[in-house]
Structures are given as structure tokens and as C-alpha cells.
């Protein structure tokens, strides 16, 4: 069944940060470049900057040191400070693939004591969904990335 799309079980990660939802959302989106690992890029050149444009229909992408840009997907939902949903157009070879129908949804939920629970869900819908799920659920995938985010909120 070459090219058939598969839906894998979603990858879910949760972190709690000592910040209001407004700050948690702002660090995740407006300060995305401050915490996203530079090693996690798809361009041929090293990544210079990671960007999430602050509106539905915006891009999320990387700017590389050679001046090139690589789109990762688009902003599907922009609901500050509660939720952002991003399309994920990257396959398991870490190449742009418009046939990938995956989404990354991040929710920011206020809890007692000034804590925000940040819930990330990566819904994978692609021909290589099982491989992609294994990669993004690996220790250096969303777990490590969300740890970087948590540290940035605390800084």
C-alpha cells in the first residue's frame, strides 16, 4: 500500500510552568526561537532562527544561516493565550511533504498557584506515520523540546 496515509496514535506531552497562561503562550509563540533547539531543523544549512507567525494562516518555519527559509507548516488556530494549532508538513525523512496531514496542538491551562499546564498533542496523519511517531516520541523529540520550553519560561 505505497503512499497510503496512516493515522498513528497521537504523541502527547505535558509540562507545568510557573507562569500565567499569557506568559506561557508568549514564550511558546513569540519567543519560539529562544527555546527551540537549533539542531532540530530541516534545511541544508544550519538554522539561524525559528519563527511562528502570530495569526491564523501564518507560517511556522526556519530561517537558515545561508538566507534560505524552510516552511514546517501553517498556523491553523491562533487563540491567545489558550491554544495554538500548527499544521505539520514534515515526513519521517524530515523533508517537506504536502501530503502529510499532521497537526500539533498546544493548550495553555491555568491551574492554582500561578501554574499553567501546557499540553501538546502531535496528531500524525501520513504514509510514514508509525515511523514519524517513533521519532517525535523519542527522548530527543517532543520530550526534550518541551523541557527546553519549560526552562525558557522559567528563565
List PLM regions with ranges.
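Hydrophobic ligand-binding cavity/cleft-lining segments
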Residues: 1-47
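Charge-dense, helix-prone N-terminal extensions
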Residues: 22, 54-55, 61-63, 74, ...
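Hydrophobic pocket/interface hotspot
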Residues: 24-28, 60, 75, 86, ...
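Solvent-exposed alpha-helix faces
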Residues: 29-33, 80, 147
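Short beta-edge strand/loop motif at the mouth of beta-sheet-based domains
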Residues: 31-70
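Tryptophan-centric aromatic hotspots in well-structured domains and transmembrane helices
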Residues: 35-36, 78, 88, 131, ...
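Hydrophobic-ligand binding "helix-grip"
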Residues: 50-51, 56, 65-113, 123
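A conserved amphipathic terminal alpha-helix motif
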Residues: 124-155
Amino acid at each position: 500500500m505505497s503512499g497510503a496515509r496512516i493515522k498513528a496514535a497521537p504523541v502527547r506531552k505535558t509540562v507545568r510552568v510557573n507562569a500565567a497562561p499569557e506568559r506561557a503562550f508568549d514564550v511558546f509563540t513569540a519567543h519560539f526561537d529562544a527555546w527551540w533547539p537549533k539542531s532540530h531543523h530541516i534545511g541544508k544549512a544550519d538554522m539561524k532562527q525559528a519563527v511562528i507567525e502570530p495569526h491564523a494562516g501564518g507560517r511556522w518555519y526556519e530561517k537558515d544561516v545561508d538566507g534560505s527559509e524552510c516552511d514546517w507548516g501553517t498556523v491553523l488556530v491562533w487563540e491567545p493565550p489558550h491554544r495554538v494549532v500548527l499544521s505539520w508538513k514534515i515526513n519521517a525523512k524530515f523533508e517537506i511533504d504536502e501530503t502529510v496531514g499532521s497537526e500539533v496542538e498546544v493548550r495553555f491551562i491555568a491551574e492554582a498557584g500561578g501554574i499553567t499546564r501546557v499540553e501538546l498533542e502531535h496528531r500524525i496523519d501520513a504514509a510514514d506515520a508509525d515511523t514519524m511517531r517513533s521519532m517525535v516520541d523519542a527522548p530527543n523529540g517532543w520530550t526534550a523540546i518541551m523541557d527546553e520550553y519549560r526552562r525558557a519560561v522559567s528563565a
